[in-house]
Swiss-Prot record:
<keyword id="KW-0479">Metal-binding</keyword>
<comment type="function">
    <text>Catalyzes the dehydration of methylthioribulose-1-phosphate (MTRu-1-P) into 2,3-diketo-5-methylthiopentyl-1-phosphate (DK-MTP-1-P).</text>
</comment>
<feature type="binding site">
    <location>
        <position position="109"/>
    </location>
    <ligand>
        <name>Zn(2+)</name>
    </ligand>
</feature>
<comment type="similarity">
    <text>Belongs to the aldolase class II family. MtnB subfamily.</text>
</comment>
<feature type="binding site">
    <location>
        <position position="191"/>
    </location>
    <ligand>
        <name>Zn(2+)</name>
    </ligand>
</feature>
<dbReference type="InterPro" id="IPR017714">
    <property type="entry name" value="MethylthioRu-1-P_deHdtase_MtnB"/>
</dbReference>
<dbReference type="GO" id="GO:0005737">
    <property type="term" value="C:cytoplasm"/>
</dbReference>
<comment type="pathway">
    <text>Amino-acid biosynthesis; L-methionine biosynthesis via salvage pathway; L-methionine from S-methyl-5-thio-alpha-D-ribose 1-phosphate: step 2/6.</text>
</comment>
<dbReference type="GO" id="GO:0008270">
    <property type="term" value="F:zinc ion binding"/>
</dbReference>
<feature type="binding site">
    <location>
        <position position="91"/>
    </location>
    <ligand>
        <name>substrate</name>
    </ligand>
</feature>
<keyword id="KW-0486">Methionine biosynthesis</keyword>
<dbReference type="InterPro" id="IPR027514">
    <property type="entry name" value="Salvage_MtnB_euk"/>
</dbReference>
<keyword id="KW-0456">Lyase</keyword>
<protein>
    <recommendedName>
        <fullName>Methylthioribulose-1-phosphate dehydratase</fullName>
        <ecNumber>4.2.1.109</ecNumber>
    </recommendedName>
</protein>
<feature type="binding site">
    <location>
        <position position="111"/>
    </location>
    <ligand>
        <name>Zn(2+)</name>
    </ligand>
</feature>
<keyword id="KW-0862">Zinc</keyword>
<dbReference type="Pfam" id="PF00596">
    <property type="entry name" value="Aldolase_II"/>
</dbReference>
Amino acid sequence: MAAAKEKSDVLVNNEIHNCAELICSICRQLYKSGWVTGTGGGITIRTGDHIVIAPSGVQKEKLEVKDMFVMSLTTRDYLHTPKQNSKPSQCTPLFLSVYTSRDAYACIHTHSQEAVLLSNLFAQKTHFESSGFDVQRYIPRGSKKNGFYKFEDTIRIPFINNTAHESDLQSNLQKAINENPYTCAVIVRNHGIYAWGDSWEDAKMNTEAVEYLFHVFLRDYRIKHSKNCRFF
C-alpha cells in the first residue's frame, strides 16, 4: 500500500467527509456499548472506489474526521493520511478482503467481551450456532441479495484462530469467508468479531444483531449453569 501522494484533500468531498463523520459517530456508540476499548477495534466505510478507515492507536471515542485514512480500493494507494503521526489501521488487510470478497460497503471490528468468552466456551467448535431468536430475521444470508434468516433457521458463524499480529489474520479470515458464503460475520478467538454489510447501516445492524445473540446466549448459559440459581 503506497503512501499518500501530494494532492487535494479528498476529505472535502461530501460523500467521503460524511463517511468520516459516520465512523466517528459509530465508534462512540461502539465504545459506549463496551465493544471497543482504548485503541482496540476498527471500522471502515466505503463510497464508490474510496474507503475511509479509522486509524490505529487512537482512542475510538475521541476520533475526529481529520484522523481518518482514505484509500483507493482499486490502486490501494492512500489518498489521505492524517498530519499527525497516526498509523494506518492494522485491520486494513482484513477490511480489503471483505470488500473484495463480498462487495461490502462497510466493515466493523469489535473487541467485545462476549465474543471472547464465547470463543473460549466453544474452544473445540468450528462455528457458533444460533436458532430460535427473533433477531435472526434482521441478519442477512451473507448479503441482502440472498435474503434474510428466519427465526427458526440455524445461523452458523465461523470461528478463526487469533494471531500475534492483526494483519496475519487475513488468510484465516479469507478462508472463513470463502467457506461460509452465508455469513456476515467471523469470530476471532480471544479477540473479537468482524462483521460487514451492504451499507454502513447494514454493517452496524449486523454487528448489533450478532452481539445480541452472543449476549443472550451467555446470559442463558450462566443462569442454567449457576449453582446459585434455582427454578420453581
